[in-house]
Amino acid sequence: MLSLSIATPGTAAIFRRGTASATSTSSSFHGVRIQHQVSARVPAAATISSSSPKPSVVMMSKREAELKEIRSKTTEQLQEEVVDLKGELFMLRLQKSARNEFKSSDFRRMKKQVARMLTVKREREIKEGIKKRLSRKLDRQWKKSIVPRPPPSLKKLQEEEAAEEAAEAAKSA
């Protein structure tokens, strides 16, 4: 714990290079005295920190489980999922621009998922000995080979609309 006290002009001590201490009252700066006080009490931060590691351990295990799940997938599955997630990001941007309701936290979550998957993909390439330049070349080829398709959420929305139309057609017939 620090305490700060302002010294009076008569007790101010100004330290210069050549001397250990010299007292001067001609300066307008009166000096600042900093004292360290040791208290016998246990600070509140110490008691809180002892209980806080439990949630962080849970978060770590959740992240580990997610990474284990990502690493268990093949590279092709990862690429397919990256395409799907990027399509979902596009749909979120579309909802945002149309001023529809959406969760803003989904942007960050999806971007992080894409980054994790691409990181695992790059880790595998490094393990196989693929250099950075060749990796970029392969990525360009992969991106050119992607067939545009609607994201899963849009597919589900289209299926729901088709089911509603079929139900309405059945009612009117």
Swiss-Prot record:
Keywords: Chloroplast, Phosphoprotein, Plastid, Ribonucleoprotein, Ribosomal protein, Transit peptide. One of its GO terms (molecular function) is structural constituent of ribosome. Residues 1-60 form a transit peptide. GO terms for cellular component: chloroplast; chloroplast envelope; chloroplast nucleoid; chloroplast stroma; plastid; ribonucleoprotein complex; ribosome. It holds the Pfam family Ribosomal_L29. Coiled coil: none annotated. GO terms for biological process: translation. The modification Phosphoserine is found at S172. SUPFAM superfamilies: Ribosomal protein L29 (L29p) (SSF46561). Residues 143-173 are annotated as: Disordered. Gene3D superfamilies: 1.10.287.310. Part of the 50S ribosomal subunit. Belongs to the universal ribosomal protein uL29 family. This is Large ribosomal subunit protein uL29c. It comes from Arabidopsis thaliana (Mouse-ear cress). The lineage of its organism: Eukaryota, Viridiplantae, Streptophyta, Embryophyta, Tracheophyta.
